[in-house]
């Protein structure tokens, strides 16, 4: 029976026919072997091309090993508390490769080496960077730096996760000394958040600023999404809900409508519908009544539809006391529809750093919130201890 020159399966009847052919003509075997080899090599080459194309069309760009060693660090901050995608103290870097493409990455290595566990992300895959205060913080203020995904990666099936890390409101004493941005400069003349935002501007990454014109200095409100408590931050071009996993980032240009619902004497809910997901209304509940005017003003500024009177999303209220005229207008003729606040069964993603919520009992959700709070308090204690150590060193220098 004819055997191909390489591992190449042939139907038995075809192999028998070829065997009969080259028995009749000895030269036929050489020609047939050459044809089989050509078919095998061509098929392998085509398979490799398809595989390479799948890689290009699939996940966001990643750095090759040959380029990793040639990265120039534009700006780095050592030993910062990363919140997302993993809760851990790491080092954050912004750099460029020889082609001029800019990248951002976190690493366990203080020299800026790319860590295999945390691949670098093309900065084009982030649409902006936001600097948000950590709410209800006692002691030294902390700010969360948020790299918001949704740039060139919007059409990619697996866009990058948000990158969130915390920095204290103090001089950037832990900035990486090898940063090109700091050459000839005293790093202590910069506050951490200012240095990071200047670095992002240096690589043309847009900065999302808070809407202080309407909200003043406190541009965030306490809210719930399902059983998950968090804060809604209102920026000039973003609305962000955080900081527990998953972080929600909504570009104002993608917001189709905002409506008010479940208005009570003390609280109200809002429903946000995005143009990219018109069939889904994201509800944020238990917002304090004092923020109604601010949110209404924000809606007017970004010119989105208010569908509070829409039959599909008509506000259901159980007003008990007299409210301002604009709130009464929303609740008109709906006082009889008393609807208690409903919590979604939305679970948070489990991983080694987060304890997911359970829809089975409020106790599990409370326990998760307590663990989250303990982790945040531990981070704050670390910052406070570092600040205390610095003060001791300073006193010794004076002595």
Curated annotation (Swiss-Prot):
One GO cellular component, as annotated: nucleus
Keyword Nucleotide-binding: no
Compartments it resides in: Nucleus; Chromosome
InterPro entries membership: PH-like_dom_sf, RTT106/SPT16-like_middle_dom, RTT106/SSRP1_HistChap/FACT
Keyword Nucleus attached: yes
Keyword line: Chaperone, Chromosome, DNA-binding, Nucleus, Transcription, Transcription regulation
Ranges where the record places region Disordered: 331-399
Subunit structure: Interacts with histones H3 and H4.
Function of the protein: Histones H3 and H4 chaperone involved in the nucleosome formation and heterochromatin silencing. Required for the deposition of H3K56ac-carrying H3-H4 complex onto newly-replicated DNA. Plays a role in the transcriptional regulation of the cell-cycle dependent histone genes by creating a repressive structure at the core histone gene promoter.
Similarity field: Belongs to the RTT106 family.
Protein's name according to its UniProt entry: Histone chaperone RTT106
């Amino acid at each position: 029976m004819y055997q191909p020159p390489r591992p190449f399966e042939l139907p038995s009847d075809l192999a028998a026919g070829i065997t009969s052919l080259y028995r009749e003509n000895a030269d036929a075997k050489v020609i047939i072997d050459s044809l089989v080899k050509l078919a095998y090599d061509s098929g392998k080459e085509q398979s490799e091309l398809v595989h390479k194309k799948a890689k290009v069309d699939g996940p966001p760009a990643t750095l090759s090993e040959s380029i990793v060693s040639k990265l120039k660090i534009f700006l780095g901050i050592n030993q910062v508390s990363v919140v997302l995608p993993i809760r851990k103290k790491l080092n954050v870097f912004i750099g460029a490769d020889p082609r001029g493409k800019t990248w951002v990455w976190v690493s366990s290595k203080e020299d800026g080496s790319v860590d295999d566990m945390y691949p670098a992300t093309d900065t084009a895959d982030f649409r902006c960077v936001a600097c948000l205060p950590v709410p209800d913080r006692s002691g030294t203020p902390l700010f969360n730096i948020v790299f918001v995904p949704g740039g060139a990666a919007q059409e990619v099936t697996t866009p990058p996760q948000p990158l969130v890390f915390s920095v204290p409101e103090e001089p950037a004493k832990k900035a990486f000394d090898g940063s090109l941005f700091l050459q000839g400069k005293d790093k202590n003349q910069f506050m951490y958040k200012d240095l990071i935002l200047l670095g992002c501007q240096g690589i043309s990454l847009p900065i999302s600023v808070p809407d202080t014109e309407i909200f003043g200095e406190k541009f965030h409100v306490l809210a719930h999404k399902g059983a998950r408590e968090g804060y809604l931050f209102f920026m000039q071009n973003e609305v962000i809900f955080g900081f527990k996993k998953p972080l929600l980032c909504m570009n104002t240009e993608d917001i189709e409508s905002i409506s008010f619902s479940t208005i009570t004497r003390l609280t109200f809910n809002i429903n946000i519908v995005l143009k990219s997901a018109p069939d889904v209304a994201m509800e944020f509940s238990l917002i304090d009544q004092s923020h109604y005017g601010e949110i209404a003003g924000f809606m007017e500024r970004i010119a989105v539809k208010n569908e509070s009177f829409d039959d599909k999303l008509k506000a259901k209220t159980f007003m008990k006391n007299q409210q301002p005229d604009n709130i009464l207008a929303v609740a008109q003729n709906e006082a009889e529809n008393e609807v208690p606040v409903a919590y979604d069964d939305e679970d948070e993603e489990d991983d080694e750093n987060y304890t997911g919520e359970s829809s089975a009992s409020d106790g599990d959700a409370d326990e998760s919130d307590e663990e989250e709070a303990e982790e945040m308090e531990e981070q704050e204690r670390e910052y406070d201890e570092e600040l205390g150590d610095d003060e001791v060193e300073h006193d010794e220098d004076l002595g």
